[in-house]
Amino acid sequence: MESTHEYCIMNTTPNIHAMIVAAGRGSRFGASIAKQYTLLQGQTLLQHSVARLAESNYIDRCLLVVAQDDSTAQTLSFALPIYYAIGGTERWQSVQAGVEAMINAGADESDLVVIHDAARPAVPTHDIDAVIQAAMLEPYGAILATPVADTLKQSYIASNTLSTPAYEAPLSLQQLNTQPELANSQSGYDTLHTYAQKTIDRSHMWQAQTPQVFRLGQLQQVLNYVTKHNLAITDEASAFEHLELPIRLVTGSRQNIKLTYPDDIILLTAILKAQFASIS
């Protein structure tokens, strides 16, 4: 992909556009409603997340990318002026739809787009401003992230049956995910368990958060590359990584957790209560 490094780095005062991706269902959360509409402290996660963006010194409106059949978002009140785009099946497809909507609305390719998860309502305002300020000085963008603090284990799947033949290698998680029939295909396997294979060096490991902030035109190009080559990505920064384009890491707060599983509600509720108490 042709680099526009020189053009982008000179534009250190770009216009800022905000996008919240809210088209997913949150299957791991397991609720009957989309998790962005979970109520905490009297408001939905989506409303909380928009309110955090509204506190930024750089954001004055927000694009919400929602599912085709979403009938809830437009019934809510938000802390920013809102406009909408229809998302796709995968997160990156929703972001791509949002980028196209922004460009069609007249945004410049050198502008910055701030992409935030609806399920991260506790991001501190100063972190939002910090990652935007960092992205202003980068040719491609910057993201919030935290250094990994816990010990990381790589795992494998195997049985505890001692009669398992030595020539049968343990099943990997990828094998089980893509070929579940293998779970019962190896002789001697009666109960499968997860085991630690090795410890991963965490000295250069970071946990990605949002907001993630990118040059709009560059993001459009890398997402087109993802589409063309049918790549699997879990966040926007990984699209840039496929092309070895540098994305700056900005240390964020550990308060900025993502609501993924039901028991995350306990921690997230406590964080929001503490944050509200500190400003009241």
Swiss-Prot record:
Matching SUPFAM superfamilies: Nucleotide-diphospho-sugar transferases
Residues under site feature: Transition state stabilizer: R28, K35
UniProt entry tagged with the keyword Nucleotidyltransferase: yes
Pfam families for this protein: IspD (PF01128)
Catalytic activity annotation: 2-C-methyl-D-erythritol 4-phosphate + CTP + H(+) = 4-CDP-2-C-methyl-D-erythritol + diphosphate
Domain of life where this protein originates: Bacteria
GO biological process terms, semicolon-separated: isopentenyl diphosphate biosynthetic process, methylerythritol 4-phosphate pathway
Pathway assigned in UniProt: Isoprenoid biosynthesis; isopentenyl diphosphate biosynthesis via DXP pathway; isopentenyl diphosphate from 1-deoxy-D-xylulose 5-phosphate: step 2/6
Keyword annotations from UniProtKB, A to Z: Isoprene biosynthesis, Nucleotidyltransferase, Transferase
One MF term in the entry's GO annotations: 2-C-methyl-D-erythritol 4-phosphate cytidylyltransferase activity
EC assignment: 2.7.7.60
Site (Positions MEP for the nucleophilic attack): R202, K258
Entry similarity comment: Belongs to the IspD/TarI cytidylyltransferase family. IspD subfamily.
HAMAP family: IspD (MF_00108)
Task of the protein: Catalyzes the formation of 4-diphosphocytidyl-2-C-methyl-D-erythritol from CTP and 2-C-methyl-D-erythritol 4-phosphate (MEP).
Protein known as: 2-C-methyl-D-erythritol 4-phosphate cytidylyltransferase
Organism of this sequence: Psychrobacter cryohalolentis (strain ATCC BAA-1226 / DSM 17306 / VKM B-2378 / K5)
